[in-house]
Amino acid sequence: LKRYIESYGLRWSVVESLPVCEAIKYGGPERDALIENYKVSLANLGKAGVKTVCYNFMPVLDWARTELDHPWADGSTSLYFNRVKFVYFDCYILCRPGAEADYTAEELAAAAEMHKTITDEERRALVDTIIVKTQGFVNGNISERDADPVSRFRELLALYDGIDRDTLRENMRYFLSAVMPVCEEYGVNMCVHPDDPPCQLLGLPRIVTCDEDIAWFLNAVDNPHNGLTFCCGSLSAGIQNDVPALARKYASRTHFVHLRSTDVLPNGDFIEADHLKGRANLIEVVRIFERENPGVPMRVDHGRTMLGDEDKGYNAGYSFHGRMMGLAQMDGVMAVVRDELNA
């Protein structure tokens, strides 16, 4: 792969992702052996010249959406998180014990109304979106070959019974402390991806959601090789997060940037927005990183489905034309910002 990339005059310096096994996250008996394997992989990447490794510490659910093709007025579609649909999935499909305690009376009432009219096909589509399509190609826990993805998903959730935020934090500290010597030896920067969306889901602890969480893991293992993947899209989906302010605060500990934006609705729903719009304020974010951490790897993240992308079978969020449009937008932003800073 390295030779193939370099044959086009490019340099392979970032890997996204080197997945962290669930047993490392929940602290299973095989944790130490799995961490040793991880250290070997890190060393091999470092020897190959890869100096930036993105990963996440999200239990079970890497990222959550309820719709993969929510329509825009211009005919394109993008990813969407409908909170009531997610409540319905949790309470009526997953049937998670105690789920109702996590939601408001209004959300539960709306989910109950949805239960009266939803069709079997709509239920299957919701399962396919939340469990299979968004999870299967990310970490391999679930695939389209699973005959009963809901039961498999319940088994994965059960692994975290009794695991709260403090326990997951300590497991993250344990993991990072173990791999930092390898990072130091081979000059590899580890950068954790924020939880997507940055809120608690399905009773699982989520520990990279906001300013306080970021400060915690950076201070817990205070090593320059322990850093952040600054995903503007994930962070902007949390109304608690001022994305440019976080960029200013954590620019020096950011090793990788994802350029994506969202619009958050008053009811808590969010939709992936145009790269030049939404609450992430990507123009200002690019300006901050170009000024405070020049040379940090940045990439356009996700894109709308448009202009025939619909029939190509692309993974959710990774359409060709939509991503090329986002890339062109961000390329223009970077050119203007660099001229501005060099003036």
PLM regions: where:
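Aromatic-lined substrate-binding rim segments of carbohydrate-active enzymes
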Residues: L1-G9
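A short glycine/small-residue-enriched secondary-structure motif
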Residues: L10-K25
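Histidine-acidic metal/acid-base catalytic patches
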Residues: E6, A23-G27, D32-V53, L61-T66, ...
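Extended, charge-rich helix/loop segments that form flexible
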Residues: E67-T167
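Residue-level "edge-of-site" marker
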Residues: L18, M58, D196, H302
